[in-house]
């Protein structure tokens, strides 16, 4: 059965000498894999529409297993991402996180629109750290992870000074600090941002400027939480961390 849908290219894998298996995140069908025959050939009509991060319209032969991609039309190439090594690292992490954090053939139109908006924002030059933090926080619910960000996990208090307890799965207030000696100290702004990014509508994002200190706190909390609960080891995350270290070194050398 032929079916048409819009999708984002999350990943491609070479298959044989001339073919690719393309993993798409689609609005209508969720995450699906399709065979793109001949897509490795330079003059193939499927080569251009099987580029990473591309947003397009795809016509495919749908089967119970791996479908076959018949043709595609680019809607947005995300060229700005692919031409920038640093942005490619961020986008690759977003794509792999979505790929590994979702099940196949489970439609989630909200997730599709959110990831599309995330890639658009990266492509247009929005701070990639901010976009990545928001994606990481939004993906928690998709993976069935629900940190307590509205009140203290122990006494339910909504006022006071809050740190983050990875062990206890959320905010812990100053009255309960002794319950987790390994809690992560964070500033009030970081606590607000964790909550904001978890519930935030990305389409409303304006110009957000975060201090490096705030970014470091967000990164520490989110990375440790993922290590403890997600069960994911992503090669793209390691590469992204290496790229961020390189970026910081380049910044220090310039100064």
From Swiss-Prot:
What Gene3D superfamilies does the entry give? Answer: Nucleic acid-binding proteins, Recombination protein O, C-terminal domain
Where located?
Cytoplasm, Nucleoid
Task: Indicate the principal place this protein occupies in or around the cell.
Answer: cytoplasm
Q: Which UniProt keywords apply?
A: Cytoplasm, DNA damage, DNA recombination, DNA repair
Judging by the UniProt lineage, the source's domain of life is Bacteria
Which positions are tagged coiled coil?
A: none
Disruption outcome = A single recO deletion does not induce RecA expression after DNA damage. Cells are very sensitive to DNA damaging agent methyl methanesulfonate (MMS). A recO deletion suppresses the lethality of pcrA DNA helicase depletion and increases survival of the strain in the presence of H(2)O(2) but not MMS.
Listed GO CC annotations: bacterial nucleoid; cytoplasm
Entry keyword DNA damage: yes
How far does the signal peptide extend, from start to end residue? none
Q: Name one GO biological process term.
A: double-strand break repair
Does the record bear Protein biosynthesis in its keywords?
Answer: no
- Role, per record: Plays a role in DNA double-stranded break repair. It seems to be involved in an RecBC-independent recombinational process of DNA repair. It may act with RecF and RecR. Is recruited to repair centers, foci that are the site of double-strand break(s) after RecN and before RecF; may actively recruit RecF. A positive modulator of RecA.
Which PANTHER family does the annotation name?
Answer: DNA REPAIR PROTEIN RECO
Summarize the subunit comment: Recruited to foci following DNA damage; probably interacts with RecF. Interacts with SSB (sbbA).
* Family that this chain belongs to: Belongs to the RecO family.
What else does the entry mention about this protein? The mutation previously known as recL16 is a mutation in this gene.
- Can you name this protein? DNA repair protein RecO
């Amino acid at each position: 059965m032929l079916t048409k849908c819009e999708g984002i290219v999350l990943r491609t894998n070479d298959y044989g000498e001339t073919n690719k298996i393309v993993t798409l995140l689609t609005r209508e069908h969720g995450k699906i894999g399709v065979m793109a025959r001949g897509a490795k050939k330079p003059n193939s009509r499927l080569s251009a529409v099987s580029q990473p991060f591309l947003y397009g319209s795809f016509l495919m032969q749908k089967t119970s297993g791996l479908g076959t991609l018949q043709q595609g039309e680019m809607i947005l190439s995300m060229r700005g991402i692919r031409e920038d090594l640093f942005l490619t690292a961020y986008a690759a992490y977003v794509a792999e996180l979505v790929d590994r954090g979702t099940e196949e053939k489970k439609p989630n139109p909200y997730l599709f629109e959110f990831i599309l908006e995330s890639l658009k924002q990266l492509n247009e030059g929005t701070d990639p750290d901010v976009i990545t933090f928001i994606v990481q926080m939004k993906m928690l619910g998709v993976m069935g992870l629900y940190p307590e960000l509205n009140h203290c996990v122990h006494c339910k208090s909504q006022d006071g000074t809050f740190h983050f307890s990875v062990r206890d799965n959320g905010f812990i207030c100053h009255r309960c600090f002794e319950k987790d000696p390994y809690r992560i100290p964070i500033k009030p702004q970081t606590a607000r941002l964790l909550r904001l990014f978890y519930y935030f509508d990305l389409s409303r994002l304006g110009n957000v400027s975060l201090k490096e200190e705030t970014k470091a706190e967000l990164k520490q909390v989110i990375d440790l939480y993922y290590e403890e609960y997600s069960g994911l080891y992503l090669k793209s995350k390691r590469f992204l961390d290496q790229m961020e270290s390189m970026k910081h070194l380049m910044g220090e050398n310039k100064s």
